[in-house]
Amino acid sequence: MVKVAFIGVGRVGQTIAYNTIVNGYADEVMLYDVVPELPEKFEHEIRHALAALRVKTELLSTNNIDDISGADIVVITAGKPRKPGMSRRDLFIDNAKIMIDLAKKLPKKNKGAMYIMVANPVDMMASVFMKYSGENTISTGNQVETMRMRSYIAKKLNIPAYEVGGYVGGEHGEAAMVLWSTVTVKGKPFSESLGVNKAEVEDYVKKIAAEIIRVLGGTTWGPGADIEEVIRSVALNEGKVMSVAFPHKYEDEIIHISEPVVVGRTVGPALTSALDENDKARLSQAIKEVYNVYKSNLKELEQVIS
C-alpha cells in the first residue's frame, strides 16, 4: 500500500497531486493546506474527475496537519510562490520559516517517510527541512530543467523529446548547468554540428521559467508532470536515473545539489563517475556557490527566528 501526502495544494501542488492520483499507483492520497476549505474543495474536484477516469484512490483533505499520518511519501509544495521579477533565492527566509515549522510537526506521525521538496528555493529548502527534522529528504532539483533541456533540443531538431537523453545538474536556479557529457541525441553523444548551440540551450534552461511566470503567472504543467515522475519512481521503487537534489556533505553543512542519481525507495548511487572532468568541476563549483549562499541565508534566518 502506498500513501502519499501533499503539504500545500496551491497551483503547483494541485497539478502534481492530480497527476499522481490519476496515474493510480497511490492507494491513498492526503491533501493538506492552511487555506480554509481549499483542500476539501480540491478533493471534490478530484473525485469528479475520478468518477470519469475510473481510478480508485482513497482521498483525505484537511486543514489540520495532525491528520497527515502514516505517509510513505510527503511532497512539500507549501510556501510563498515566485512572482515575476523574483529570484527563487528571494524566497529563502519566508519559506524556510515554514519548513522549520513543518519539520517539527510532520515526522511525529510519518515515521520513515521520504520527503520530497518542491517549495522554492527548492534545494535549500530541502537542506533546511533535513537540518531541522533529521528526516530523509530530497528535492526535485533539476528534473524539471532536465526535461526543459531535452524538449528544447528536440524542438530545434524536430524530433520527439524521448529521443534526447541527458541531464541538467547543479542548483535548481541560478547555478543550473547542462551536464553535456551525459547528453545524447538518438543514442549518440550530442554535438553542436547537429545545429544546436550549447550556450543557447543553457540560456533557455535558465531563463524560460521566468518568461513563463511573466506571461502565465507561474509554471504549472511542466513541473506537474516532471515532479510526478519523481514521486512515481519512489513509490514504485522504479530505480530511474533522474537529476534530483540529494544530500551532499560540504564543509559543516548538508547541501542538496542535483546530479544524475538512481531514484527509488532509496536514492543512490549517483552516477558521478559517468561525468567527464569538466562536468565534475562545474558541479564542484556549483556546490561551493550554493553552500556560500545557504550559509549566508542561514545566518539571517537564525537572527529572524531567535
Curated annotation (Swiss-Prot):
<dbReference type="GO" id="GO:0006089">
    <property type="term" value="P:lactate metabolic process"/>
</dbReference>
<dbReference type="InterPro" id="IPR001236">
    <property type="entry name" value="Lactate/malate_DH_N"/>
</dbReference>
<keyword id="KW-0816">Tricarboxylic acid cycle</keyword>
<feature type="binding site">
    <location>
        <position position="33"/>
    </location>
    <ligand>
        <name>NAD(+)</name>
    </ligand>
</feature>
<feature type="binding site">
    <location>
        <position position="88"/>
    </location>
    <ligand>
        <name>substrate</name>
    </ligand>
</feature>
<dbReference type="Pfam" id="PF00056">
    <property type="entry name" value="Ldh_1_N"/>
</dbReference>
<feature type="binding site">
    <location>
        <position position="120"/>
    </location>
    <ligand>
        <name>substrate</name>
    </ligand>
</feature>
<feature type="binding site">
    <location>
        <position position="148"/>
    </location>
    <ligand>
        <name>substrate</name>
    </ligand>
</feature>
<dbReference type="InterPro" id="IPR022383">
    <property type="entry name" value="Lactate/malate_DH_C"/>
</dbReference>
<feature type="binding site">
    <location>
        <begin position="118"/>
        <end position="120"/>
    </location>
    <ligand>
        <name>NAD(+)</name>
    </ligand>
</feature>
<dbReference type="GO" id="GO:0030060">
    <property type="term" value="F:L-malate dehydrogenase (NAD+) activity"/>
</dbReference>
<dbReference type="GO" id="GO:0006099">
    <property type="term" value="P:tricarboxylic acid cycle"/>
</dbReference>
<feature type="active site" description="Proton acceptor">
    <location>
        <position position="172"/>
    </location>
</feature>
<dbReference type="GO" id="GO:0004459">
    <property type="term" value="F:L-lactate dehydrogenase activity"/>
</dbReference>
<feature type="binding site">
    <location>
        <begin position="8"/>
        <end position="13"/>
    </location>
    <ligand>
        <name>NAD(+)</name>
    </ligand>
</feature>
<dbReference type="InterPro" id="IPR001557">
    <property type="entry name" value="L-lactate/malate_DH"/>
</dbReference>
<feature type="binding site">
    <location>
        <position position="82"/>
    </location>
    <ligand>
        <name>substrate</name>
    </ligand>
</feature>
<keyword id="KW-0560">Oxidoreductase</keyword>
<dbReference type="Pfam" id="PF02866">
    <property type="entry name" value="Ldh_1_C"/>
</dbReference>
<dbReference type="InterPro" id="IPR036291">
    <property type="entry name" value="NAD(P)-bd_dom_sf"/>
</dbReference>
<comment type="similarity">
    <text>Belongs to the LDH/MDH superfamily.</text>
</comment>
<comment type="function">
    <text>Catalyzes the reversible oxidation of malate to oxaloacetate.</text>
</comment>
<feature type="binding site">
    <location>
        <position position="95"/>
    </location>
    <ligand>
        <name>NAD(+)</name>
    </ligand>
</feature>
<dbReference type="InterPro" id="IPR015955">
    <property type="entry name" value="Lactate_DH/Glyco_Ohase_4_C"/>
</dbReference>
<keyword id="KW-0520">NAD</keyword>
<protein>
    <recommendedName>
        <fullName>Malate dehydrogenase</fullName>
        <ecNumber>1.1.1.37</ecNumber>
    </recommendedName>
</protein>
